[in-house]
Amino acid sequence: MVASCKDQKKAVAICLQRSPCVMIERHNPQECLDNPELNKDLPELCIAQMKAFLDCKRGIVDMTKRFTGNAPLSTGKYDQQYENLCKGKFDPREEMEKLKLLNSQQKD
């Protein structure tokens, strides 16, 4: 994976880990994305981040962006959060509150 899309990829992974589909219903993130029944209940924030990630990936092969560049290189902004979620070092209630807060900010 090109370095310019790593932050978007981790943002999607974190959002999916915080989603009710994973936290409450105990599905894995891939099932939440692939299954249309589960997919319709994903938070808008996760869907928006997924679209940004896919646009970034599309930009990698887009010849018009070869000269202007796709996006800035990865900043490592989500590395620690991603690491904690992967290793299970988190409080599920706190993560659900973060998702609700982020989702409510996006609707405003």
Curated annotation (Swiss-Prot):
Q: Which Pfam family, any one of them, does this sequence belong to?
A: Pet191_N
Motif Cx9C motif: chain residues: 46-56
Q: List the disulfide bonds.
A: 21-56, 32-46
Q: Which residues form the CHCH domain?
A: 18-64
Q: Which GO terms of type biological process are on file? A: mitochondrial cytochrome c oxidase assembly
Q: Which domain of life is it from?
A: Eukaryota
PROSITE patterns membership: CHCH (PS51808)
Transcription regulation among the record's keywords?
no
Ordered alphabetically, the record's keywords are: Disulfide bond, Mitochondrion
> Could you state one GO cellular component term attached to this entry?
mitochondrion
InterPro entries, per the entry: Cyt_c_oxidase_assmbl_Pet191
Q: Does the keyword Lyase apply?
A: no
| Motif interval(s): Cx10C motif | 21-32
According to its UniProt record, where is this protein located?
Answer: Mitochondrion intermembrane space
- Free-text function comment from the UniProt entry: Involved in the assembly of cytochrome c oxidase.
Q: What is known of its domains?
A: The twin Cx9C motifs are involved in the recognition by the mitochondrial MIA40-ERV1 disulfide relay system and the subsequent transfer of disulfide bonds by dithiol/disulfide exchange reactions to the newly imported protein.
* Family note: Belongs to the PET191 family.
- Could you tell me what this protein is called? Mitochondrial protein PET191
Q: Which organism is it from?
A: Saccharomyces cerevisiae (strain ATCC 204508 / S288c) (Baker's yeast)
